[in-house]
Amino acid sequence: MASSSGQNGIQLLLAAEQEAQHIVNNARTAKQARLKQAKEEAEKEIAEFRAYMEAEFQRKLEQTSGDSGANVKRLEQETDAKIEHLKTEAERVSPDVVQMLLRHVTTVKN
């Protein structure tokens, strides 16, 4: 009877060990499934964020490149206006400068 009860105890322990192994395997499988799902969700969020940032970059690039054409045109106009102003001023003071130079060149000092 003692050996039968010992045999039953061993069988009970083996069954409990198998049950525990089954529980551990189920937990491991569930954990792997959760990790896989979390990884997929993270990759999806990363892809969405990357697409958003790329769209923002392209939008800003279009704005700045569009502005640069306008800026170049504006700068050309400002430069042309300054050149015309300098030409006008040069024409205005040119006779005075010529007179001053002639006076200094023709005046003899001892």
UniProtKB/Swiss-Prot annotation:
GO CC list: vacuolar proton-transporting V-type ATPase, V1 domain
GO MF terms held by the record: ATP hydrolysis activity; proton-transporting ATPase activity, rotational mechanism
Annotated gene: VATG1
Name this polypeptide is given: V-type proton ATPase subunit G 1
Alphabetical list of InterPro entries matching this protein: V-ATPase_G (IPR005124)
Cited NCBIfam families: V_ATP_synt_G
Organism: Nicotiana tabacum (Common tobacco)
Entry function: Catalytic subunit of the peripheral V1 complex of vacuolar ATPase (V-ATPase). V-ATPase is responsible for acidifying a variety of intracellular compartments in eukaryotic cells.
One Pfam family hit: V-ATPase_G
Keyword Ion transport: yes
Entry keywords, A to Z: Hydrogen ion transport, Ion transport, Transport
Lineage, broadest ranks: Eukaryota, Viridiplantae, Streptophyta, Embryophyta, Tracheophyta
Subunit structure: V-ATPase is a heteromultimeric enzyme composed of a peripheral catalytic V1 complex (components A to H) attached to an integral membrane V0 proton pore complex (components: a, c, c', c'' and d).
